[in-house]
Amino acid sequence: MQTFLKGKRVGYWLSEKKIKKLNFQAFAELCRKRGIEVVQLNLSRPIEEQGPLDVIIHKLTDVILEADQNDSQALELVHRFQEYIDAHPETIVLDPLPAIRTLLDRSKSYELIRKIEAYMKDDRICSPPFMELTSLCGDDTMRLLEENGLAFPFICKTRVAHGTNSHEMAIVFNQEGLSAIQPPCVVQNFINHNAVLYKVFVVGESYTVVQRPSLKNFSAGTSDRESIFFNSHNVSKPESSSVLTALDKIEGVFERPSDEVIRELSRALRQALGVSLFGIDIIINNQTGQHAVIDINAFPGYEGVSEFFTDLLNHIASVLQGQSSGVAGAGDVAPLKHSRLLAEQAGGLAAERTCSASPGCCSSMMGQEPPWTPEADMGGVGAGSTAKLPHQRLGCTAGVSPSFQQHCVASLATKASSQ
């Protein structure tokens, strides 16, 4: 057993539904076997009374959204949480609240992806054009759509990327269909991808790719089809069987995602936001073979990730070891160590594939100043050309204070009314 873990304390706050779905008590038991004390936090009490805490794991997405709606109880919970973080910059937070707010806003997360792709300059990546609609469609809507590179058919999603309603989407095929769009929302070009979605589940330096069913191909351009309304969660369930996912035939390119591309995208998001627990939805354009990021999720469900608890514990051990050895200073973003590709083929699960990243594996991301650093756009959580830590704990170095990090993220993060 790694002796440096003994006596460490990990606090967590998850909804009861999330705890049951993940069977998080099993993770707590796994931690205890390694000498780590696990504490379920009660945000209705001062966190100070429940500390000290070396690590906090949370999914406060519901609470943050309620606070943004001026719910007094949620505002108090978020304030109490932030107050503890500000008072204890040594505590590792998985994941920072400003980053979570960015991922809760599809418009902002899509803009971040656009900047990351422009920085990476990788022809294998080309996510669809998007645009935010803040008012009902009017006479100039078509002009705005065209100016932003959008063309029929396109997919319409809620701006908020969390909650039951966030899965309610529509495919619009013509101008008449615009009348049913309810702002605020984000519209995104629909890319044919042979009805296959790849869900990338990231835990620190590890990630697992799981194949899921997705929407079938549709003809490009305007058509007289009526808009299709659907729930993306239902469509992309592992066992989903729907007329929307029934592919008549495979068209054009049918390729697997590149492990290298996924590794660099994951690493770039970790660098830009300082997140450790997130999911990326990727499709492969059946005309070009390019990877397209169509959504990013904070602390997803990790369905199909059999080693989630092991990966999470290893990540916690890694960041705690870095903290205790003094190597967790600014400037280090370790390349992703391995991935597991659990693609569900017609005959069942494909064999697990592991990739160990060498120091040069992500060379295209090294030695360049990314556009999301403060000097470039005030959109990231770094300073100058300094790369941020994979776990990006708030105030993890003397040179980066919590208030400065929050300021740096402000142009991309959704600001809650509690702040």
UniProtKB/Swiss-Prot annotation:
Q: Which residues bind Mg(2+) 2?
A: 295, 297
Q: Do the record's keywords include Transit peptide?
A: no
> What are the EC numbers?
2.7.1.134, 2.7.1.159
How does the cofactor attach, per the note? Binds 2 magnesium ions per subunit.
Q: What chemistry does it catalyse, as a reaction equation?
A: 1D-myo-inositol 3,4,5,6-tetrakisphosphate + ATP = 1D-myo-inositol 1,3,4,5,6-pentakisphosphate + ADP + H(+); 1D-myo-inositol 1,3,4-trisphosphate + ATP = 1D-myo-inositol 1,3,4,5-tetrakisphosphate + ADP + H(+); 1D-myo-inositol 1,3,4-trisphosphate + ATP = 1D-myo-inositol 1,3,4,6-tetrakisphosphate + ADP + H(+); 1D-myo-inositol 3,4,6-trisphosphate + ATP = 1D-myo-inositol 1,3,4,6-tetrakisphosphate + ADP + H(+)
If you read the UniProt record, what top EC class would you report for this enzyme, in one word?
A: transferase
Where does the record place the ATP-grasp domain? 117-325
Q: Which residues carry this modification: Phosphoserine?
A: 401
Q: Which SUPFAM superfamilies match?
A: Glutathione synthetase ATP-binding domain-like
Required co-factor? Mg(2+)
Name the keywords, alphabetized: Acetylation, ATP-binding, Hydrolase, Isomerase, Kinase, Magnesium, Metal-binding, Nucleotide-binding, Phosphoprotein, Transferase
Q: What does this protein do?
A: Kinase that can phosphorylate various inositol polyphosphate such as Ins(3,4,5,6)P4 or Ins(1,3,4)P3. Phosphorylates Ins(3,4,5,6)P4 at position 1 to form Ins(1,3,4,5,6)P5. This reaction is thought to have regulatory importance, since Ins(3,4,5,6)P4 is an inhibitor of plasma membrane Ca(2+)-activated Cl(-) channels, while Ins(1,3,4,5,6)P5 is not. Also phosphorylates Ins(1,3,4)P3 on O-5 and O-6 to form Ins(1,3,4,6)P4, an essential molecule in the hexakisphosphate (InsP6) pathway.
Family the UniProt entry places it in: Belongs to the ITPK1 family.
Name this protein carries in UniProt: Inositol-tetrakisphosphate 1-kinase
Q: What is the lineage of its organism?
A: Eukaryota, Metazoa, Chordata, Craniata, Vertebrata
